[in-house]
Amino acid sequence: MKTSPRRRKHRRRTFRRLFWLLVLATLLLLLWPRRVTLDGLNSPHAILLRADSGEVLAEKDADSTIYPASMTKMMTALLAIEANPDLDTPVTLPEEIFPALQAQNASLAGFQTGETVTVRDLLYGAMLPSGAECCEALAREVSGSEEAFAARMNQKAAELGMTGTHFCNPTGLHDPEHVSTVRD
């Protein structure tokens, strides 16, 4: 049974319409904004931001006080780089920092008492193996003491609008007053 030219033309038109409708539907699905949820996330605190605008896409208890632990080292590294952009500057690890860190079972990068290394080495040691001795050495290099460096950390946090953050040390070792929020 042959189809008439009129019927074939109608089928082609119908096929084209269906094709373009499918293309349009696919584009709408791809471009339509979706609501992001954090329902399946195991963490009690989270925030998801757009990198280009800072817009909050989703959050979960983002303003609750938490202990920042090793996230502290990001502020330590930032201040060390700002204070000393020459990453090849030599720094000697002071003997007095090690006993307290070892007593607290702090994570160490493996540098030795009295060893002279560069600021770059200390930054790597602080950020990669989470070396507390590196953070202490950087703090003393930048501000002279852990306390003065913590004050500088709090000043920088205020400049950055981190209203829920208070630093007590450059390492992130536990202190009940060493706090932050995931929003900060």
Predicted regions and their residues:
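Structural motif marking the loop-to-transmembrane transition
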Residues: R11-L18, E115, V119
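N-terminal Lys/Arg-rich, disordered targeting/topogenic segments
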Residues: M1-F15
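Hydrophobic membrane-insertion alpha-helices, especially the h-region
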Residues: L18-W32
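Active-site-adjacent loops and short helices of periplasmic peptidoglycan-processing enzymes
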Residues: L30-R183
